[in-house]
């Protein structure tokens, strides 16, 4: 889940997404940032109460709105202290099984040497640490990176991310065999291949569960592995109910290991739900 923006959340959509998350046996729930609107203490308290209602396992990474917008000294000196207290470590968290490896990268910054601090930044060190972790994945594991900002601009997206270091990170992650880069920030769902390597590293963006809609209804993504394909379904809240708005099916790269993804076909399970 991502871009809930507590303090400006769509309460009905959040309640529906929470019920949905608790109703199905997801392998992992991912929160891709902007959990608060202004990084206020009361907003993080709401986030903490909400996360307590969500199923486990759960993995999270912060967004640019998760720094204290009104407290500039704290934003510069300790931008993610409030996030860490309410949610957990802001960077390099991971979930790992023989079938799945997910690692977070914190693409948000409390401040930057540019006017718009809301844009993303991934250092080369962050990228290479993530690459090294991906290289330790089990041979047949789906490899996933979760961060707030899209590493490269989404075609037709409602806004930009302008991630410094994004192109370098995308190219290195693709070379490392990453299958999915999950993000938020744009408040609109999309699936696009990154233009590197074999073209089978996919940027997957989720919508929003806030009132800050940008041309898409509040919603989240359900991501499943179906044999040698990846299915991404954008769920949308119409004010009364959740429904599948669109589904993308894209091919997954073959694995050199001894296992076979075909063994999953009989009982496909969502490995992650991204509500944003």
Which residues make up each language-model segment?
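N-terminal active-site segment of His-dependent metallophosphoesterases
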Residues: 1-53, 69-70, 136
């Amino acid at each position: 889940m991502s871009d809930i923006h507590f303090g400006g959340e769509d309460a009905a959509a959040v309640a529906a997404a929470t019920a949905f998350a608790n109703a199905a046996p997801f392998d992992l729930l991912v929160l891709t940032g902007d959990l608060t609107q202004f990084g206020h203490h009361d907003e993080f308290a709401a986030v903490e109460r909400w996360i307590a209602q969500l199923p486990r396992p759960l993995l999270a990474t912060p967004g640019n709105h998760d720094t204290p917008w009104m407290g500039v000294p704290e934003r510069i000196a300790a931008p993610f202290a409030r996030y860490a207290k309410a949610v957990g470590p802001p960077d390099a968290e991971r979930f790992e099984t023989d079938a799945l490896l997910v690692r977070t990268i914190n693409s948000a910054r409390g401040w930057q040497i540019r006017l718009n601090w809301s844009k993303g930044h991934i250092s080369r060190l962050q990228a290479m640490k993530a690459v090294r972790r991906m290289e330790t994945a089990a041979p047949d594991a789906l490899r996933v990176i979760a961060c707030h900002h899209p590493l490269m601009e989404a075609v037709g997206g409602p806004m930009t991310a302008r991630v410094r270091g994004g192109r370098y990170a995308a190219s290195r992650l693709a070379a490392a065999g990453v299958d999915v880069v999950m993000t938020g920030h744009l408040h609109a769902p999309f699936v696009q291949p990154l233009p590197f390597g074999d073209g089978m590293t996919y940027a997957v963006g989720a919508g929003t569960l806030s009132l800050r809609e940008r041309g898409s209804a509040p919603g989240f993504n359900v991501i499943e592995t179906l044999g040698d394909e990846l299915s991404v379904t954008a769920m949308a809240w119409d004010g009364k109910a959740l429904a599948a708005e669109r589904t993308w099916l894209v091919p997954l790269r073959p694995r050199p290991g001894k296992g076979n993804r075909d063994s999953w076909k009989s009982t496909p399970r969502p490995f992650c739900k991204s509500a944003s």
